[in-house]
């Protein structure tokens, strides 16, 4: 009976271990493929700290994290664009980009398209520069929190002070 328990426990471990391989997110395998292609597993990659992880650890509030994440995703989209003609890593980049779309953009295609359009604007294009400066005041107004609409309450001490002096 004792050996039967060991055999059953071993079989359970094998089954659970194999399920773990199939349940893994698809981007993990593709990220490993990109690591091999870019030799990103080498020890010298860790020199001088991380690019993004320390920044993400610093910011805990959801709004702050979204700002940082948007810049990081923008970087990855530009990186993938530079290697779009490389057939050996094309599938990996597409899989990861699709997963980013699901996780960051909530599968909202329009949101992703607008994001990519923003990241593709060239800062060196004179027409883009002129339009950006033309829209600057409105963009700055959008950055400010909306004013709270409502009546302001006057301090009761003002009225009490006047009554006392009269």
UniProtKB/Swiss-Prot annotation:
Pfam families: IFN-gamma. Released primarily from activated T lymphocytes. It is found in: Secreted. One of its GO terms (cellular component) is extracellular space. The modification Pyrrolidone carboxylic acid is found at residue 24. SUPFAM superfamilies: 4-helical cytokines. InterPro entries: 4_helix_cytokine-like_core (IPR009079), Interferon_gamma (IPR002069). One of its GO terms (molecular function) is cytokine activity. Residues 1-23 form the signal peptide. The keyword Signal applies. It comes from the Eukaryota. One of its GO terms (biological process) is positive regulation of autophagy. Glycans are attached at residues 48, 86, 120. Keywords: Antiviral defense, Cytokine, Glycoprotein, Growth regulation, Pyrrolidone carboxylic acid, Secreted, Signal. Homodimer. Interacts with IFNGR1 (via extracellular domain); this interaction promotes IFNGR1 dimerization. Belongs to the type II (or gamma) interferon family. Type II interferon produced by immune cells such as T-cells and NK cells that plays crucial roles in antimicrobial, antiviral, and antitumor responses by activating effector immune cells and enhancing antigen presentation. Primarily signals through the JAK-STAT pathway after interaction with its receptor IFNGR1 to affect gene regulation. Upon IFNG binding, IFNGR1 intracellular domain opens out to allow association of downstream signaling components JAK2, JAK1 and STAT1, leading to STAT1 activation, nuclear translocation and transcription of IFNG-regulated genes. This is Interferon gamma. It comes from Callithrix jacchus. The gene is IFNG.
């Amino acid at each position: 009976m004792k050996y039967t328990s060991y055999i059953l426990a071993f079989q359970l471990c094998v089954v659970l271990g194999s399920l773990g391989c199939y349940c893994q997110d698809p981007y993990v395998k593709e990220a490993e493929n990109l690591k091999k292609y870019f030799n990103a597993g080498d020890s010298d990659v860790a020199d001088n700290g991380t690019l993004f992880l320390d920044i993400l650890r610093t910011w805990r509030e959801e709004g702050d994290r979204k700002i940082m994440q948007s810049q990081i995703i923008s970087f990855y989209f530009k990186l993938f664009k530079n290697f779009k003609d490389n057939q050996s890593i094309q599938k990996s980049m597409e899989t990861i980009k699709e997963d980013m779309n699901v996780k960051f953009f909530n599968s909202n295609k329009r949101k992703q398209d607008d994001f990519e359009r923003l990241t593709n604007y060239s800062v060196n294009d004179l027409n883009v520069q002129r339009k950006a400066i033309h829209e600057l005041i409105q963009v700055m107004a959008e950055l400010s929190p909306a004013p709270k609409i409502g009546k302001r309450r006057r301090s009761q001490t003002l009225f009490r002070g006047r009554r006392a002096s009269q």
